[in-house]
Amino acid sequence: MPQVLEFSDVVVRRNARDIVSHLDWEVSDDQRWVVLGPNGAGKTTVLQLADTLLHPTSGSVTILGERLGRTDVFELRPRIGFASSAMARRVPPEETVLDVVLTAAYSVTGRWREQYDDIDERRALRVLAEWRLDHLADRTFGTLSDGEQKRVQIARAVMTDP
């Protein structure tokens, strides 16, 4: 099976402290993983690496055959479906549910003044309907329950058909 994610001797160091230390990890396209550990163990850091939001201090991270540091992450990000509580904190609370899902097609969080393609808006509405969230399309993200926010994050993650 081809690897969708490969960490080789990955180290992430902050203030002379290893947050992640010499991690080797491979994920093939037929696998599903859960990342567990105590607070401060580096779970969020590992997921930020996998979502191209962070580069390792040393070692290599390869995602979908593209090595971080040697590829344009803005072209890679739309191919990655990712949902997390950390991502939810980056969503402006006044952002509509439709825009939270729609902006995934452009690898951004938060709508500014951009104009988005009609085809992407139609896809976002279809994804919302598939996840039974279409009735929330015009609601703001900050007014949703935690459960609704999590479902919107999943819809956002599948928006790009990763």
Where are these regions (language model features)?
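The feature captures the beta-strand-to-loop junction immediately N-terminal to the Walker
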Residues: 36-38
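Conserved structural motif at the start of ABC-family nucleotide-binding domains
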Residues: 5, 20-22, 137
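ABC ATPase nucleotide-binding domain "signature motif"
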Residues: 145-151
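Hydrophobic anchor residue at the start of the ABC signature
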Residues: 154
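ABC-family P-loop ATPase nucleotide-binding domains
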Residues: 85-143
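Conserved ABC transporter NBD signature motif
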Residues: 59-69, 76
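Helix-to-loop junction immediately C-terminal to a conserved catalytic motif
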Residues: 51
